[in-house]
């Protein structure tokens, strides 16, 4: 493939930015001309001065615009912030969009996309809503978002106009291809007023190659110190990630078991500190891969998710994922053929008790089989091959 590809994402960290980098690195490894453009390397909470205008806009969205009772993030004023449009090389043949909020405005997108192939990987619902990143049951994105529950009443007109602008813009980009990492998100996008007339491909997100290395460590037992569980979130206090559910269920399931441990990975989490709770802070990929190799289960209790990479990453280390039955997570479990979904905290407690019992009786799932399933389904090589067909208009 001789065409040049530029991946665009507001941050090179987080889910969208990580996927952009993994794809670009693998494409470059295969000899393609591929690069990543991002505004910041971290996130606005961790490094607010890295993009001060975007930080202010994000603060306005969070504290002035968003309805206090709405638990998912929104982007409205942030979408109007100038970003990378002037930095996109004029010679790029393919523009591959990821996390667009604050990276490229909708108005600018229609200008830079002219006469070029545009691929947009959806990492949440925001590309086809007026503001929210997850609608949490609201279906207004099917029409016009006029009664948006995510924002305070004075801003609902702005949300409606923003969605109308997205709908109009998508009709002005002839070379646009849409990709969703899960059937769940693809189905919602197909129902939306924004992408109703577009073909949407479903391609899983790739696993960071770091989690596929050091196979002996990846599948080694290394769990001689008792039952080990882990929960991960960029911000452990994020209400959407619902880490409190994981902590509560773990305490109930391990009552009377002195050597069990739940590791919490991410920023904050001080309110969860207590007996058998290990606050690990933020870990890099290599550190996290090593820790997952020594965990029995990963708990993902989120109230809303698309297809979080951490599920495949944990499985690639032989760790069993226990995930809430929301978004595209059930589909990931079915693809892996390993792991379990739960519908409420009581079910999670029961699953943890079952894992502890199986481990004690020597019936734990073969970690090598779990790791091999993840490698087969989510390797960068396989995912890049799928995207190659999208670039060529064959998928």
Predicted segments with their positions:
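Aromatic "clamp/platform" in nucleotide-sugar-dependent glycosyltransferases that forms part
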Residues: 303
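A charged, aromatic-enriched C-terminal amphipathic alpha-helix characteristic of glycosyltransferases
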Residues: 217-219, 361-392
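Short hydrophobic beta-strand element within catalytic cores of glycosyltransferases
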Residues: 320-323
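Carbohydrate-associated surface elements
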Residues: 184, 206
């Amino acid at each position: 493939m001789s065409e040049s590809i530029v991946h665009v994402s507001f941050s090179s960290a987080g889910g969208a930015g990580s996927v952009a980098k993994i794809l670009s690195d693998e494409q470059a490894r295969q000899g393609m001309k591929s690069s990543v453009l991002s505004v910041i390397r971290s996130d606005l909470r961790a490094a607010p001065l890295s993009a001060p205008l975007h930080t202010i806009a994000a603060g306005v969205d969070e504290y002035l615009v968003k309805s206090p009772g709405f638990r998912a993030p929104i982007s409205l004023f942030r979408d109007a912030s100038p970003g990378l449009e002037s930095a996109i090389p004029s010679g790029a043949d393919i523009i591959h969009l990821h996390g667009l909020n604050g990276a490229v405005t909708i108005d600018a997108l229609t200008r830079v996309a002219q006469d070029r192939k545009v691929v947009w990987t959806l990492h949440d619902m925001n590309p086809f809503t007026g503001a929210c990143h997850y609608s949490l049951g609201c279906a207004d994105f099917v029409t016009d978002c006029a009664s948006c529950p995510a924002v305070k009443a004075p801003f609902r007109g702005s949300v409606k106009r923003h969605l109308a602008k997205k709908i109009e813009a998508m009709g002005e980009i002839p070379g646009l291809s849409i990709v969703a990492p899960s059937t769940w998100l693809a189905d919602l996008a197909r129902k939306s007023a924004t992408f109703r007339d577009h073909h949407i491909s479903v391609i899983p997100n790739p696993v960071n190659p770091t989690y596929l290395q050091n196979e002996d460590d990846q599948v080694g037992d290394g769990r001689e110190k008792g039952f080990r569980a882990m929960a991960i979130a960029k911000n452990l206090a994020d209400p959407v990630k619902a880490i409190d559910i994981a902590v509560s269920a773990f305490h109930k399931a391990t009552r009377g078991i002195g050597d069990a441990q739940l590791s919490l990975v991410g920023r904050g989490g001080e309110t969860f500190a207590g007996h058998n709770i290990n606050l690990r802070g933020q870990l890099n990929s290599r550190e996290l891969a090593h820790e997952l190799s020594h965990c029995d289960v990963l708990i993902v209790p989120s109230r809303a998710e698309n297809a979080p990479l951490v599920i495949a990453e944990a499985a690639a280390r032989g760790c069993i994922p226990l995930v809430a039955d929301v978004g595209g997570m059930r589909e990931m479990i079915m693809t892996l053929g390993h792991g379990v979904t739960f519908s409420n905290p009581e079910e999670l407690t029961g699953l943890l008790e079952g894992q502890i019992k199986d481990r004690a009786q020597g019936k734990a799932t073969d970690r090598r089989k779990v790791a091999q399933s993840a490698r087969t389904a989510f390797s960068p090589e396989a995912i890049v091959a799928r995207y190659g067909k999208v670039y060529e208009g064959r998928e």
